[in-house]
Structures are given as structure tokens and as C-alpha cells.
Amino acid sequence: MTEPNKPLDQMTAQERLDLGISYLGESRFDKAIKALSSIRREEVNPETYAGAQLGLGVAYAESGELKQAIEAWSNIRRSDDSKIYAQAQLNLGAAYAKSGKREQSIEALSSIRREEAAPEIYTQAQLGLGLIYRDQDKPDQAIEAWSNIRREEADPETYAEAQFNLGVAYAESGKREQAIKTWSKVRHEDDPKVYALAQLGLGVAYHAQGEPEQAIKTWSNIRRSDDSKIYAEAQLNLGAAYHAQEDWEQAIEAWSNIHREEVDPETYARAQFNIGKIYEDKGDLERAKEAYCNAQDFFYYNYGRVKRILECPPKVIEKLHDIAKNTDEILKSLQIIPDFESRVAHYSRASTAFTLFGDDKNPSNFRLSTIRGVNDPTEGLVLRDYWEQQGISETIHTNDTATFVSCFTFNHDSLNQFRLYGKEDGREATGVSLVFKKEFFSDQPDTLGFIAGPSTDLSSKSEQNKSNETGKTEGDNKKQLIGKSTLYRCIYLDPETGYWTLAQRDKSTFYREHNEEADARGKWGKYYKSISTKEDDVETHLFNKGNNEEEDVETHLFNKGNNEEEDVETHLLNTGNNDNNSVSNENNKIKSISQILNSIFTDKNHPYNKCNKYEKQKILEAIRFILLPLQYLVKHIAFQEEQECRIMYITQFRDEKIHSDREKQWMYVEYEEPVLPHIDKIWLSPGAAKDQDFFRILLDQGSGKSKVRISQNPFRNKE
């Protein structure tokens, strides 16, 4: 430890400089500050003074006194010593950035010249400049800064980071070839972690270019020792690539390389879910159950489904599994069509919209309310009533869950929905229509995360970083939020006649959206074809009754023929083997849920009718759980005009995510995603038009086109 042999006032300036630097190396910052601050410009040469101020700034910074550090470094002039000046400017740039003063940081870093500074100082300055420009959403300037960094000048880590960042900037700018070229420059010996990130990006780029083999080769370059989390992400991608090639064994091997202790819980669960899905599709339910069990904290439905199926008598397991597979196919058909249904509307009170947007700077969370509060008394019961009409008297619907929904519609500016919903003080047409972008919802529809597992003691979870299922930490006194949910369209069914249709956009909306009639007609034609395909799939997997000659045809909502001039026609829906039916012969070989349930419960020779009471109960429990995702997606035909789609959360009443207020009769859960960033536009009913300017303040900041629209529907509110 350094100890001076004489007082500071008896030392030369050089001795005080040496002493201060020595104190700095020993982290004795107070003493370093005292020694270095005693050196005045007029008593020493410029280089010595610059060195003292550089060290003084470091001592202040290490002591947490950033303002004094900035003052010290600012005392150094380029004419004192160009290399020390460059180091000081680098430090200043970092200090300003830490203080949130980006423009001053840019000014400091930009003052460092390649020809005057040490190479590592110049390259670090360019790296920092690029990061600031990136954060300012100035990709061209960021690319220019990072492109200034040469391998021969920079240390390997700085060069690798610059090349990785460059690749990301190119990829985000749509310059995929340049991204590939740039990421390919990063070597493993430069920085293993950054190399792994570059290889991960390379694989994604190759995959996007339709080069799966090159993507697989690239992701395979990433080692667990490089970074366990990046390795896990690469293995997740590898598994998906192999799965797309139907190489099930390689996919399972890749996903099995992801270890629970090395990654975040959701990544591990996703890998195990994928493994379970392969085994389930192959009919290996025991191994599927094992994998799903590992994923149940995030993807409970599949685990619960397989578990219940395996608890049933072996002679009915295959049929129950067929019901499960049909359910999956139906849910795929109920998903939105991104190219045509990328925006959906939610009708609400204007006052509620203001709280969601955060006009008080503290936005509230979007809510899913209990199903018991909706205006449809048949919610969750329509399928039950339909099964009863088919002669199935057993109770195969569930009524002991806590179900929460939030409803959306393809009708963005609907007179009737303005009259029914979002009413202020009970007055019609006083609400607003919030039009959401598709990014508000989950883009991973295969996991059915909206069905939660049995409630656990969340007090134990709070000891584990108080994290919820989305990985988002909440305060001690806050309820957990539900993560992004998949948006599903509803099926509208008349349980007495069996007549049904899917929620969908109206033809008129295409003419509102597209000015040119030919464009609107073309888009409508493509959309109509997509919806027809979805309807055929739902018919095949849910409603098809098979070869009943007495019920050879049924009437459906509209004709799938080629006459576009007729808006509503009769669609002949074959329930047998008519080759002219739009449902293919191959699809007719598939036993629908209706057919399977009918055979189980109405055929006296079916194994179900030979089971004892306990076994029958297990079978009923399995069927109820399998069909649970569909129970609240089938609505009564009377509500068809609403063209509804919805997100759901189905859980137990003990779930601690549930908010309740008995006096106000409130029960709801809160959604994780903020509302304001996902709003495409807002339609104001006539009664809410007075709030137009207030909504514009919140929604139109920085945008050239207003997101706030006044409804064009004719309506006169009776006072």
C-alpha cells in the first residue's frame, strides 16, 4: 500500500501525479482525488495536467460523483495530448450516456479521430456511437459507425460485437444478404457468446431464405459452453427445423438437449411441449404424458388431456385421442387469417378507454371479465344443447370452472354494436370501438395456454423471485397478469337444427377498406375461399354425421359456388359420401367429434356401455376436459350478427390472478400487454364525438394520420 514520505505541498507535480495514480490503482479514491486535484494547469506541462484530470475523473466516477467526473474530463483539451484527450472524450461519452444525455454523448464520442486516438479507443467510441444511434432508431447512422470498426484496429471482443450489431441492423432493414455476410465475420475465438449470437442470427436468416439445411448447419455450430441460453434457443430452432422436415427423432433429440436448470422455465417447457406433441401425434401417450408433465406450468391443457385419457379403460383410449386430435384441428380453423383479419375491434365506454390509454400517466390493464356477466344466457351451453338434440344425454360440458373472456369483432364501425355496448349512463351510441392490431395477441396458437392448471400455493412462488407465468415480476401487493392469448373466432350454432356458421368479416368491409372496386372484389374472393376452407374443416372435425342416408344434405349459411352476385345463398353440406361435396373424400374418412360421441353414448354395443360406474365417470371427465377449449367458442346463432372472436382464460376459482369485488359484482383477470401501443385506430360513436380531441392527444402523437375516427353510421340518440 502506497504511503507518501512527505506532505503533498512539499511534492513536485509529477510526484503528486504518480501518488494519485498509485492511489487510484489501490481503489483509494478519496486520497487519489486529493492528490490529483492539487495539480494546477499553470504549474505543469499540458500532458501532465491532462493525465491528472483523466485520473481525477476516474476517481470521481468510481466514487459515484459523475458530475465532478464530467467536469474533470471536460478540462482536457485536444492540444494537451491527443491520446489522453481521446480517452477523456470516451469516458465523457459513457458518462453522458449513463446520465441520459444522448446528444452530448454523441458529441463527445464523435470528437474522437481515428488518426489521433489509440486504435482501441477509437473503435470503442464507434461501438458506443452505434449503440446510441440504434436506441434513437437511426439505423443508417448506427450502421455507419459500426462499419468504421476494423478487425486490425479493435480488440476481438469489440470487433465481434460491432459485427453482430451490424448484422442485426442490416436484418432489421431488410438487407438479409448483408446481414449474412456480416455475421459470418464473427469468429468463435473473438468472443464465444457473441459468436453464438451471430450464428443464431445466421440460422434465422438462412431459414427465412428457404435454406433449411444451411440453417441447421449454422445452429449446430453453437455449443452449450458458449452460452447455455443461446444454445437452448438454437436447439429450439433446430428442433423446429427438423420437425418441418418430419424428422421426428432429430427434432426430439434437439429439444431434449434443452435442460431445465440452464434456461428460463418457459423455454424448457416449450421444448418439452414440442416433444410431447410428437409423441401424442404418434399415439405414444405414455411418453407424451411424461413430456407434457414437464411443461404443465405453462401448457397445462395438453398434460391434463393426456393424463385423463390414460386414466380411462384401454378400449376407449383411441377414440378419446381421436376427439383430442379433432379438437386441435378445429382450434386451428378458428384462428384468425392474418392477411385479412389483422385488426379486430373491442367496444367499450369512452371513460374505460381513457384509463386503458393512461391519460393519467398510469394506464390500467386490459381486463377479461367473468363469463357469467355477459348478455348471452346460453354461454357455454350451446354445444351441450346440441349434443342433447343428437341423443347424447350425458353431461359432457363443464360448469365448475372460472372462465374469463374479452370479446372482439370483425365489425369495426357497427351501428348495432354501438347501441348495445360501451354505453355511458345507459345511453345508446355513446361508446367507442378500439381497433387492435394482431400483435396484441399471441402468435403461438398451438399451446392453449389460456387453460390454467390447478391453483398452487403462490406464496411459495413469491419466494422464487415473485415471477408470474410470463416471467414478469409483480409487486407484493399486485395480482399476477395473464400472458398474451390466442384470438379465436366463434362458431354460431342453432342447437335445434344443427345450422351453423363461423364468425367472419362482412363483404361490405372490403369495399370500405379498398377504394378500387376490383381490388375489393379480389380481396373478398380470396378471403371467401379461406373462410370456406375453414368451414369445411370445422364441418369435418366437429359436425359431420357420416353416412346417414336419411340426412344426406343439410342447409348451411351460404353457397360455396361461384356466383358472387348473390350475397346469401344455400350451401349444400353433405354429411355422407357425395363426391360433389366440397369436403374431400379423404376428409370424409375422418370421424368427427359428433360421430365419435354418438358412437360412444348411443351405441349399446360400444365398450362405454359395458364399463362400470367409475370407468364411465373417468371417460366423461376426459371428454369434458378435451372439449373444454370449444365450450366457450360456440355461441347461439341468435348472436351471429356480432361476428365475434375472443380471448379466454379458463381456471379454478382459487386462482390468485382473479380480482373480485362482491359489492360491485366484479370478477376479472388482467392482461399483460399494454393497450396503447397496439391500437390501430379508434372509432367514436356519435355520443362520444365530443372526446375526439382528447383521444387525438393520446393517440396521434408523432403520427401524420389521425387514428381517431367518427362513426359514419346514422344514429339519433333520444334524450
Region roles according to the model:
Residues 43-44, 80-81, 116-117, 153-154, ...:
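Alpha-helical junction/boundary sensor with strong preference for TPR arrays
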Residues 274-277, 281-283, 289-719:
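Partner-binding and oligomerization surfaces adjacent to conserved cores of proteins
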